Amino acid sequence: MTINRRELLGYGAAALGATVIGLPQIAKAAGELTIAYNVNLPSWDPTTGPSAVNPTIQGLYQSVFDQFIPQKPDLSFAPGLLTEWGWNDDRSKIMMTVREGVTWHDGSPFTAEDVVWSLQRAGDEKTGNPIQFVWKNVNNFKIDDNKITGDVVQFDPVYFKWMSFLTGYIMPKAYYEKVGAEGFEKAPIGTGPYMVDKFERNAFLRLKANPNYWGGKPAFENVTIKFVTDAASRVAEIESGSSQVTLEIPYEEYDRLIAKDGLAGSCNNVSDIGMIFFNDIDVMLDRNVRQAAVMAVDKKLLVDRLLRGYGQPIDTLETPEYEAYDPSIKVEHNPEKARELLAASGYSPEKPVKFTIQTTKGFKPKDYEMVQAIVGMWRKVGIEASIEVYEIAKHYELRAADKLAPAAFYNWGNAIGDPTTSTGFATYGPSPHSVWDSQDLIDMINPLWGEKDETKRVAGWKAVDKYIAEQAYVLPLIQYAQPIVHAKGVNVVQHVSGALLPALMTPA
């Protein structure tokens, strides 16, 4: 059996940035911590519905629930509720070993039955798991004490990686069957480091440390997470001392705040990227329009001027840390060529091509301002784009229904660094996470889903990335650096996935 515990990305301690250490101003009272969070939590089931694939709320889910296989802050795999996992030699079966002695938040024992039920539920189309097409690839599970085997229906090279990613959470079988979906929303339980004490939708979440957590009780006894979706309000929260930790604030505010007495921070590159979806509707069916829209954008200028040098430009949906990153794939910034392409389709600055671009505002640092700047760059070459602002939840709703505007800004998270979970799901037509449906790309990607030769698989994805860049099927923008500001009385470990985890925080 091959146990898949290899590190996915080449981060070491240095790449993580220092664990930021400071002194005084301990959170309000000993054992109390308040965090100003940037998004609301729409649902408590981390395995169903649009919220399950929202990378920005995974830190909340990971505080209450455990994933099958956890990731360390550098994104390497670690033993968790599964202590061993892997395939047999011909990849026809999987084997897993389940940690013993773990309890759910209600005191009931966690068992291998919970693992199997969670996997079967995730693979059932009726459940509503947005990643069901991955989980259905293994069935016929058998339990022998704390050992589990399953039959591979269709080989998926990233099956175990998904156990550390979106929807890869273990749910409580007996409790869920007892209370049902509605009861679970009212009183969720997991095996994670924190238990839900109180939850007010669109207001706050109060967590209480799990004294029986298998990984050790967290340092902070009580954690209050305020849902503060406005970036300026998050700045006020941390500056006033009302909150001791916040994230995703404008970079100029980050620089200003960490220079103040009593505050510190970290701002390292994470696995998130900023991108613009192109939907294969209306004017986006014209390759000249797409290529012009890509060539007109000066990504380096966006990073240097708008993001104050934080983050880095990208030309594909892969960052340098992802497995299929290919530095040879370059897309030039060439406004003159963009004008020529538009002219060939009958457009000019005097007679511009028109479409709508959708974006969030304050969800990520400078998201709206970045789109404003891009619209300005487009205007100079003959593209007139009108901006429509929406909440992130609306983006998921529209994307799942394939009803995004011709262009839509988005923050794509890929904590496992695999090309299937970046290029694959973002551009493969049948995926519920893509709005580009052209058959040429579908045909090119299809053989890669089940490719057993890892070298061939990664090379295949690199070829897909090159083709997408040539056809301008998407507009990759930047790899994000995530700003976190905190009181010097709190130590914060930045997680490369972008998840802000109170269980990793300690008093200084």
Where in the sequence are the language-model features?
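Gly/Pro-rich hinge or "lid" segments in bacterial periplasmic/extracellular proteins
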Residues: 62, 72-76, 165-218, 222, ...
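N-terminal lobe/hinge region of extracytoplasmic solute-binding protein
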Residues: 37-89, 120, 189-190
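Long beta-strand-rich cores associated with HINT superfamily self-processing modules
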Residues: 484-508
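Ligand/substrate-recognition segments at binding pockets and active sites
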Residues: 201, 343-414, 428-429, 454, ...
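Surface-exposed binding/hinge segments that line
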Residues: 86, 97, 132-175
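Ligand-site clamp/hinge motif
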Residues: 210-256, 384
